[in-house]
Amino acid sequence: MQQEMKIVKPNIKQGKRSTVSKYMETNRICLFNEVCCLCDTDIKAEIDEIIWQMTHGSQIVPLKIEDLQYLYEENVIEKRRFCSFADNKDERMESVVREMKKHEPVDKNSYEHVLILIQTSKDHPLMMSELQGLNDVIEGFSPKAEIRWGLGTNVDLWNRLFIMLVCSKK
């Protein structure tokens, strides 16, 4: 899986939080799921990381640090990352959306805030037609959920599409 940055995770004392991480690779999708149930204030470093990724990865349609401060007050944060490896069978957005639907949050309707970061390379920018695929994913969230999204570029992606989805609630 392509990583846009290297991050050193903080040492968190056992019993302070519950984290489930898994890595799954298919022939077209590279998927990294990370579900964090926040139980203590020791999780600040991980929230800092999410905010850094969201704000520094969204240069075209930016997400602002001050707009993401609510994450420090949330009790549950679920972070999922998807990177397409499009081939002739599927378009890159179709392949990511299919995997997002397979691995979507357990109860999408319960989340109050949703952040979506979309990245492509400058040579293979996001097309307006590709954004239509995200509508199916977004429709499953509560109508009351606040949804924010950012768009950026990453030179390492070439023809791939990267999406990071962060869902949270109190």
What are these regions (language model features)?
Residues 1-170:
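Tubulin/FtsZ superfamily GTPase core signature
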